[in-house]
Amino acid sequence: YKRQGTASGYSTFNSGVGFLLTYDSRDIPANAYKGIYLDFRGLMYQKFLGGDNNFYRLEVDYRQYKKVGNRKVIAWTAQTKNVFGDVPMNQYALSGTPFDLRGYYMGQYRDKSSHVVLAEYRQMFNTDKSTWVKRMLHHLGFVAWGGCGFMGPTMGKIEGVLPNAGVGLRIEVQPRMNVRLDFGRNFANDQSLFYFNMTEAF
């Protein structure tokens, strides 16, 4: 690389251009019950644009949601992130965020190609709200998910498999907006992490 790591850290400058194509039919993006989301983007980083390296990035993010009952949803996603060329280390594809493999530290695994597949069951309790206990339960719910990540130096060469599963609590603060409390398990390293957020993971 043009700039190497030093005692004070790693530094590089990237400048690029790209495109973004998005299709979104979700009813409510923050907590979808139905619909499809598809995001396809490509970026080109070049020295003639002022950056330090010549490399490319290609990402696809597909999500789908199906309502299977009253306040019950199955959601699934397939995502791929890929970089090609003279890629600086801080631009490698990575897995392990609050929005994909929950349970893995962000940046713990990175390579030139990262793929994630996840499926999640989401349910809010549905009561008649006739008592204060039932009214309280009506604002609670849970999720359970499972999936896997795959890492490698190219799209066709997988060198790391990252299984993932977890459960979560949902607290409805207003219609279709939940506080998200997730407990994710990292089976590759036998570690677990907790997450707090105001939107669903995907």
Annotate each PLM feature.
Residues 6-10, 17-22, 26-136:
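C-terminal outer-membrane beta-barrel translocator/porin domains of Gram-negative envelope proteins
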Residues 11-12, 46-53, 109-113, 154-162, ...:
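Solvent-exposed loop/turn segments connecting transmembrane beta-strands
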Residues 143-145, 178-184:
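Conserved active-site loop/cleft motifs that coordinate metal ions or position small ligands
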